[in-house]
Design a protein with these regions (language model features):
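Short helices/loops that flank or line small-molecule/ion binding pockets
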Residues: 16-19, 33-42, 126-144, 269, ...
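Extracytoplasmic/periplasmic substrate-recognition and gating elements
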Residues: 20, 143-149, 155-220
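Bilobed periplasmic-binding protein-like "clamshell/Venus-flytrap" ligand-binding domains
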Residues: 40-60, 115, 210-217, 294-295
Length: 295
């Protein structure tokens, strides 16, 4: 891809964590233990929850919830099952996918855990993903799962750094040794084979261009020649380091690889219905399975 983003990020307030003695989790179980701990610690604080979330995005409402599911399929079922799921070698309602979705539901459908500073779990469906993480700045939410590009959504003047107002940590795998990584990106397409077009395309795939663009700011790149130290921010530097980590098991955003009827259709709407409590996990996943094109 020309540019890339890391989706396996959890945004948080380093200061709030330090004040409460919370540590960045290293495993999924650690994350769930931390979630329960925060819920217990804040039960007397009206409106404060461990997590905040938002999946509203106009005609694309639901896509942030699909990212959650993809991250958990990659973690709980593994890369091989993830690949088979994306290519429909296993059905959308396979038991492994049901399990992964229910793991997401352990957070997003639990009113004790969401939606900090906003409402209950169903408010997630009407909260813009752009606004979903902002309660962290108000102290009414402690964590928000969203990609590296969310850095641009924080209000002007927000200190985004390891010791600042907000930062991000890697969404942990099931064990500390595993490093599944959900990614996304944009691609360059050539519509002519003229020499000058090929020359531009070759240049845009070079380490020189990637390093120059990363240094300008606001983006990351999966180009292996990129020097992470050239990144314009600490978050983007962390994203590049994760993309280049030889121990990471990286996979591209699954919904982007699925047929559009599913990846940009029934998967989005199905997850929105699920968040709204209209359908349970198996019903939603079966509906999505039945929407998969036969040819």
């Amino acid at each position: 891809p020309l540019m890339a983003s890391v989706k396996s990020f959890v945004w948080y307030s380093p200061g709030a964590f330090a004040d409460k003695g919370y540590e960045v989790p290293e495993t999924w179980d650690d994350l769930m233990t931390l979630t329960k701990k925060i819920a217990d610690d804040t039960k007397d604080e009206s409106g404060t929850k461990p997590w905040c979330a938002g999946i509203e995005s106009g005609g694309a409402t639901g896509w942030p919830a699909t990212d959650w599911v993809e991250d958990l399929v990659l973690r709980s079922a593994g890369a091989d099952a993830y690949d088979k799921w994306v290519t429909h070698e296993i059905p959308f309602n396979d038991p492994e996918i049901v399990k992964a979705t229910d793991l997401v539901g352990n957070i997003l459908l639990d009113d004790d855990y969401v939606n900090g500073g906003i409402g209950d779990s169903r408010s997630i469906a009407t909260t813009s993903f752009n606004d979903g993480g902002l309660p962290i700045l108000e102290g009414s939410c402690y964590m928000y799962r969203m990609a590296s590009f969310y850095e641009a959504q924080w209000p002007e003047g927000t200190d985004v750094s390891p010791d600042g107002d907000v930062f991000a940590f890697y969404l942990p795998g099931m064990t500390a040794d595993e490093k599944p990584l959900l990614t996304a990106g944009e691609f360059v397409g050539a519509f002519s084979d003229r020499p000058e077009v090929q020359a531009v395309q070759q240049y845009m795939s070079s380490g020189l261009w990637a390093n120059t663009r990363v240094e300008i700011g606001g983006v990351t790149s999966a180009n292996k020649a990129v020097d992470a130290s050239k990144a314009s921010s600490d978050v983007l530097r962390l994203a590049i380091e994760l993309l280049q980590d030889p121990d990471a098991t990286a996979r591209f955003d699954g919904s982007d690889l699925m047929p559009s009827e599913v990846g940009a259709g029934s998967f989005w709407t199905g997850m929105t219905q699920w968040i709204n409590g209209e359908k349970d996990t198996e019903t939603v996943l079966t509906d999505i399975e039945n929407s998969w094109p036969t040819s």
